[in-house]
Design a protein with these regions (language model features):
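Short SAM/SAH-binding signature in class I
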Residues: 213-221
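Conserved class I S-adenosyl-L-methionine
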Residues: 136-143
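Conserved SAM-binding loop of SAM-dependent methyltransferases across substrates and taxa
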Residues: 148-158
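S-adenosyl-L-methionine
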Residues: 177-212
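Membrane-proximal basic amphipathic "stem/tether" segments
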Residues: 17, 49-105, 110-111
């Protein structure tokens, strides 16, 4: 699938400072032969969560049955948004990451390598800033990982609110939960398999249960775009739960698919204000809910 081309771009990026390995060259060669491949790459569980490194590719969601239309959209958007995918390999400057960890009073090795499918430092700073400013009682997150770790630490420092995070991969959710607990922080991470989306939205969506009735901060960092470029738009189904004055943070907001989502959100939710911060590797959409 398009993952092969993304992986080839990753190999080209990662080998700028060193000679390309034989496996890398083979990936680059094979990527040109086929756009559709039923076996996208995945990382091991240890690679996904260790502080030293994480896998570049997200876990395999392709056991889902994608419609012909969804497959076409993924291929079409993949053809135009590869520059954003390539740019996203950069998780941010090492200094920015070090500054973030120092601000949270965490050791330099507390976070894994960032970038690719993971949050970059700019998005993580937005999470910390929102929590410090709002002191939210309830944070809800879609897609767990480094962002959950940072949000849990920020809540520990600023206000002591709660975070509930949903992720489609049960084992990854459990591993992330252990990672956070091992660092003496608090977060509730739940498995939410992907299934039918809310009416009016394409792709597949989290099958959510026991969602908090009121949300102060909604963090949207999943599902991955390879399910459908507009898949994260279904997060709007949670907007009625956001309290007046509450906020939304959407990761990867500079990508073409997320820009379409943002336009629709602005049109359909007049009581909310959305602003794009294009800084960082991937961009962040900042949402604010007015009182009426």
């Amino acid at each position: 699938m398009f993952f092969d081309i993304v992986k080839a771009l990753q190999c080209s990026w990662s080998t700028r400072r060193k000679r390309r390995s034989a496996p890398c060259l083979e990936i680059i060669r094979s990527a040109g032969h086929s756009l559709i491949d039923c076996c996208p790459l995945r990382g091991s569980w240890d690679e996904m969560t260790t502080r030293e490194t994480t896998a570049y590719m997200p876990l395999n969601d392709m056991d889902l049955s994608l419609s012909l239309g969804d497959r076409f959209m993924v291929i079409a958007y993949g053809a135009i948004q590869w520059p954003w995918l390539l740019r996203s390999l950069d998780g941010g400057r090492k200094k920015d990451k070090a500054d973030l960890l120092a601000y949270l009073d965490l050791p330099l090795d507390a976070l894994p390598n960032l970038g690719s499918w993971k949050a970059d430092t700019n998005f993580l700073w937005h999470i910390v800033s929102a929590i410090e400013d709002m002191r939210p009682a309830q944070v809800v997150e879609l897609g767990c990982g480094a962002s959950t770790f940072v949000a849990a630490r920020a809540l520990q420092l600023f206000g002591g609110g709660k975070i509930v995070s949903f992720d489609q991969h049960a084992e990854f959710a459990a591993t992330t939960q252990s990672w956070i607990l091992d660092n003496k922080m608090d977060a509730e991470i739940r498995h939410a398999p992907l299934g039918a989306p809310p009416a009016g939205w394409p792709g597949h969506w989290y099958q959510l249960s026991d969602v908090p009735k009121e949300i102060d901060l909604l963090i949207v960092d999943g599902p991955p775009w390879a399910i459908h470029p507009h898949v994260r738009g279904a997060a709007a189904s949670l907007f009625p739960r956001i309290r007046p004055g509450g906020r939304v943070l959407l990761d990867d907001a500079a990508r073409p698919g997320e820009r379409v989502v943002a336009r629709r959100w602005r049109k359909e939710h007049e009581n909310m204000e959305f602003t794009l911060d294009s800084q960082g590797a991937k961009g962040t959409l900042l949402g604010y809910k007015h009182s009426a």
